[in-house]
Each structure stands twice: as C-alpha cells, then as structure tokens.
C-alpha cells in the first residue's frame, strides 16, 4: 500500500534528528511511524526494548529508590537510567525503559513495553502502556497513554486518554484526507 509521506517518521517527528539515537527508539523509515507498535513487525518497539534491556549496564539499582516505589519484573527488567527522577508511590511493570532526565511523578503507573525518553514526563496518576514518549513529551496528570507514540515536546492536557481499541476485534481505520485506510493494528 502506498502511504503519503506525512505518515512517515521524518515528517511527523522532524526534530528527532537533534537527539542521540541511543536515547530514542529507532522509528520506521520506510513505512508509517505506527508500525513500530506492531509486535510482529521487524524492529518493533517490543523487540527494541527486549534488546535494550538484555544488554543495558546503566540502570539504577532499584534499592536506591523510596520503598513506596514498586517493581514487577516477572516478564522483564525495569531499566531506569541514572539521572531519571522517580517520585514516590510509582509502579513499574517490566520490561520498560526510563531514560536519563525523564520524570516519573507521584502515583504514576508505567507498564510493559513503554519507552520514556529523556526529559519526558509521566505525571501524577498517569498510566503508560506499550507506548513511546519522545524527548520532552508530557503526560502531566491524570492521563492514559496506551499503544501510542507521543511526539517530541507534546504536552497533553489534564485527563487526556490516548486509546483506540476496536471492540469488534477489527483493525483501527485511519482517515487521511478523504481516504480511509487500515492501520494494521487493533489497538492504536
């Protein structure tokens, strides 16, 4: 299927070239940006996080955090870079990755296959699942970000929910101009 260039990563996220490639996931160059969320696609978010956590030496020791911060690492490790700010009463489910200078605020819930880039914020009572918060992205309070890519320096308002699950099991349909196109994803 031929996609317009507006759905490609270079068009959607032009400022990403200013960031170190070590701190952000590799977004698709030859297809729509959201294909990174498809667990079966080559170089998916899931595959990148699995590769990152299996070889990552710079994680903080979880014992150095407040006892109110909890970790579920039954399915994989929670990697938190030195320099990330983790506030009390947060919960993490691995595998997930929190970059240097990311901020995870009080009461946040970071679930499996989330990649929180440098200077991104997961705020008070916010939940992130199988998503990417690119550098400087903010879900500051009472947000849900699921199966999504939140762009560089995007700031969500209070209580915003990014979730698009088809209850009938079909894939999510995109509207691009007057066209309706299947995304290939049931959650997006």
Predicted regions and their residues:
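Structural signal for interior beta-strand "rungs" in well-ordered beta-sheet cores
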Residues: 63-188
